[in-house]
């Protein structure tokens, strides 16, 4: 358990940077340095390939998201001027905030940096004050047989103890349709993934090479990712585990990036800087989903503490960054926090961000979990956004058993994983469209409250909402038969009859796979036979884009292997 001054997230401390003014008395540690402008850069938004991956550029192009000044890197000359001031080392760069985080033990250097004409502000983000927050990653375990005796399922036995947390949201039906997150990139922000490199729960993940990258934003020591802390292991297993009959995660076929942003041994605003740096890096890679089972409100140095008034989505750096990430096309999913039974009571940053999914926790009976933080945000937004099972939730333990535990850190990956499955089904849709469908599918959509938000989503309903409203995301309705198909596919596009139509196919990751141009739909019903197109494709899930006369239509289809 955490001490009384702590605010649980997974049963972790949740703290946030206090937006106070620069301190007259500085101390050894880390500092946030924000610059005045981005003048005289050696980069241009007309050449984004110089600082963004092609996957990121492709996603932006596909979703119609442009490039702006925030995408441009920090001026390297400005960074050099700061580092030349004395005993200063660079911790992070933030292009979204036009800032850097530095480390120094010389307070005189900080005053000299403040005086530079290129510097807009300097704030302390870390000092040497420690108040005993070392227990922030404790897990409150409950007996495994709590689920074993009542929640196994004969119809879907592969889920084992994880059955109820998936079934509650109808996630098993997305899986049965073949949507298990394949081709979707999920970045997990956490503290450590102890034994993830050897645990059986992640064997298939490792063998298939779907841990695509790791990065340590705390100590810049990637070799320690698979050690130091267990929290990330437990959270990852809820999404990625594959132990049929014991535990299958919500997105067992997705790709994963493991980013350490949390220092498990202290609590300071620099962890927000780490979060920002990781979010920017995720965007540059073209990541689709961020799961962050983290939150910030109180710090080891009380002078840096946040207030509930700061939980307005527009004050803390990590909350602002979460919204920027969403605007760049990333679906951000964050734990609401575990302060429901504490004096703090409310959600913490970045869960207060406007355009993300803030996830609360319920028990197996779909009742508010006693620890789950309450909303609203201080500016009146409905928070949490949605809720999922986080009390007695099943996860992979370090001894290779399946354990259960409490925390919104466990409900968040349930939602993040199933959201990835929905993105797989609709890869051409924006994160906002996916988020809105999830919210609209929830059990309390018409009457949200401060405990569960809009309620518990139903991912079958979310899929149906997206299918029903598909023409709204293109211009005109298109249907396909058979779907799933093998080497034959016929589409009907009534609005394009007697027109020349160009067809383009994208895979689940949004990559261009094949196209056919100039297909004239002369049939009276606007029918096109795309057998030659689908014959070129391997088995998998695809999006078909039809384009004619400045008009567009989209649909999802699946190609299966020949029997």
Language model feature labels by segment:
Residues 25-144:
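Inhibitory N-terminal propeptides of secreted protease zymogens
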Residues 473-481, 485-563:
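C-terminal outer-membrane/trafficking sorting elements
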Residues 190, 351-424, 428:
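Extracellular S/T/G-rich loop segment that most often corresponds to the catalytic His/Ser-adjacent loop
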Residues 26, 44-45, 121, 162, ...:
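Subtilisin-like serine protease catalytic core
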Residues 115-185, 197-201, 302:
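Protease zymogen maturation seam
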Residues 163, 285-291, 424-479, 483, ...:
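C-terminal subdomain of the subtilisin-like protease fold in secreted/lumenal serine endopeptidases
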Residues 236-239, 257-263, 346, 390-452:
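Hydrolase catalytic cores
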Residues 280-312, 335:
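Short acidic, glycine-rich surface-loop motifs adjacent to enzyme active sites
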